[in-house]
């Protein structure tokens, strides 16, 4: 069980990396603005600024898996991103199964604001929030 930790979660993508912050006390997460990326390479300065602002105890990176639990081509890229986060910032990083989070995020956004609300940045941020909330559930 986790007591009073702050966590940041990332939904890795080649063009955009969703981000969310959460607290273990409530087990909830809030979407933050997504980071732009070029072919999976983020603006590390922006990520560093976010880490300095929130001072997380742990980072959680969504791990994309096939529905049967096997790894896909993108899985190794997400692992590499997680390793780079740890290497650059020295913060503990854990991976969390992210199957269906993008679908759930799109459904949630559509229910709130309809088709026009479905922009990529919002989807990525809410996906990261769902990843973090499922990580909290796994550790409660």
UniProtKB/Swiss-Prot annotation:
It comes from the Bacteria. It is an enzyme of class 3 (hydrolase). CDD domains: YqgF. One of its GO terms (molecular function) is nuclease activity. The keyword Hydrolase applies. Its main location: cytoplasm. It is found in: Cytoplasm. Keywords: Cytoplasm, Hydrolase, Nuclease, Ribosome biogenesis. GO terms for cellular component: cytosol. One of its GO terms (biological process) is rRNA 5'-end processing. Its EC number is 3.1.-.-. SMART domains: YqgFc. Pfam families: RuvX. NCBIfam families: RNAse_H_YqgF (TIGR00250). Belongs to the YqgF nuclease family. Could be a nuclease involved in processing of the 5'-end of pre-16S rRNA. This is Putative pre-16S rRNA nuclease. It comes from Mannheimia succiniciproducens (strain KCTC 0769BP / MBEL55E).
């Amino acid at each position: 069980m986790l007591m009073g930790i702050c966590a940041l979660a990332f939904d890795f993508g080649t063009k955009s990396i969703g981000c969310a912050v959460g607290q273990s006390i409530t087990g909830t997460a809030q979407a933050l603005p997504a980071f732009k990326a070029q072919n999976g390479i983020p603006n590390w300065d922006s990520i560093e600024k976010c880490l300095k602002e929130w001072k997380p105890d742990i980072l959680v990176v969504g791990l994309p898996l096939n529905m049967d639990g096997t790894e896909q081509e993108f899985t190794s890229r997400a692992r590499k991103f997680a390793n780079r986060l740890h290497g650059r910032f020295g913060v503990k990083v854990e991976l969390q199964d992210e199957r269906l989070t993008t679908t759930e995020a799109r459904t949630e956004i559509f229910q709130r604001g309809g088709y026009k609300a479905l922009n990529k940045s919002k989807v990525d941020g809410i996906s990261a929030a769902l990843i973090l909330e499922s990580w909290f559930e796994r550790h409660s």
